[in-house]
Amino acid sequence: FWLVLARRLASYADFEKIIIVGSEAEIKHMKHFAPEFCYAKGGATRQESLKNALALVDTPFVMSTDAARLGVSSELVNRLIKSKEKADCIVPVLKCADSIIFNGSHANRDELGLIGTPQLSQTKLLKSALEKGEFYTDDSAAIASVGGKIDFVQGDENAFKLTYQKDLLKLKNLGFAPPDSRVFNGHGFDVHRFKEGDFVTLCGVKIAHDKGVLAHSDGDAPIHALCDALFGAAALGDIGEFFPDNDQKFKGADSMQLLRECVRVVKSYGFEIINADITILCEKPKITPHKEAMRKNVAEALALAQNFVNIKATTMEKMGFIGTGEGFGAIATASIRYFDWSKGEPKLY
């Protein structure tokens, strides 16, 4: 949604630059989607994020908005720009249609208004206000705290804030088309050497064996391959970028937990997982007795029914390092698609 809003805003006016705030990890991938925009690292609060973005602003005026207000119109943006000389901060406001209770008493709704975004401010004054270190719920409150003048323009009911899952359904009434329906496929491959030991972990199942696995984490190659397949399908890079093997934080890590984090990341970019297929390459141990337990573990991590997950195995006919028992490997394929918000709650099968 951030990308849709950014491109809509870019089409509304000749902005000097459009700055998008995100986490450090998100920005790396956001740039792949839209290199034409500027990016600022987010803070622990909206206010900290705003300060970080303002550090990149050198124009006399700055307009800021919540990325969750996807319905911001060109008319609202133009109203703000036309009024920029009237005050230090121009704010869109809507009248209250409902009765209001405040501290147990009925308030006069005619004296109240609903403030929204975008808000257009004098850059220098907004920066100065935020340096005070106090907490403000929006830009206008910060400007007012240093004596700045606030003026209002008519708000836009369509610029509501997407707060709850059900709010997504309102986008249909604004003419937003459902997301791309194409399916995206990813492929993953991983290998590990054996070492002295008495078990291996495959798809979260601990299996007795006459050897152990040489690895930074728990050496669960099928899960590492599946993570790569999911990241690849979403064009987010590979497992090493998210869980580097030189980071002590992941020393001995439970790969099933890494898979759950991988799923969280992929879903955070708007995707839902369709299915997964894993092939384990090894001479020993025998996989068949453990396939259903593996399948159950993977399905739970992906939030899929087990019939959307497949586990299979093959030997290398005594050829290569796998065939001679030096190690083992795994190949995984995953299919994903964009979550279709027009149909409501995400489908977990």
What residue ranges belong to the model's regions?
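Conserved active-site beta-strand element of glycosyltransferases/polysaccharide synthases
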Residues: 149-155, 160-163
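Short, conserved loop-to-beta-strand elements that form functional interface hotspots
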Residues: 277-286, 290-322
